[in-house]
Amino acid sequence: LEMGAFINDDNLSSRIEEMYDLFPIIKEKKDQFAGELSGGQRQQVAIARALMTNPDVLMLDEPTAGVSPVIMTELFQHILNIKKQNIAILMVEQNARQALEVSDRGYILVTGKNAYEGKGDYLLNDKDIRKAFLGG
């Protein structure tokens, strides 16, 4: 987490405590090397490290890739908690259904081009989008 605070370490210890509150597993595993953590735990460390700079925008590229369904749900809950802190989140995610559930706005790409866009709940409830991308 300290690596993520390299830009501004004025409140390093308080920021670390905030990350421990947001991601309790990190506090529990703080004496382990990141390479010894599970994929989901490493993702939480990566997100917490990015949050150490107190960003206005957090960019996430496939945050749930390679994690179990249980951990995926947990990661999306963390994303919702971050969103509540008024941090804008730009996320690329293959799990369209869960991503749209937590999104204010969504964009669906087809062969690299924007095919659909709108509010997350609108896209989730669109019959054609559900059939083509969300399994019906």
Regions found by a protein language model. Give the residues of each.
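ABC-type ATPase nucleotide-binding domains, specifically the catalytic core motifs of the NBD
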Residues: 1-14, 22-24, 136
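Conserved ABC ATPase signature
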Residues: 33-37, 41
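ABC ATPase C-loop
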Residues: 50-51
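Conserved catalytic motifs of ABC-family nucleotide-binding domains
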Residues: 54
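Catalytic Walker B motif of ABC-type/P-loop ATPase nucleotide-binding domains
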Residues: 58-62
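Helical segment within the ABC ATPase nucleotide-binding domain
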Residues: 73-85
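Short, glycine/charged-rich "phosphate-handling" switch motifs in NTP-dependent
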Residues: 105, 117
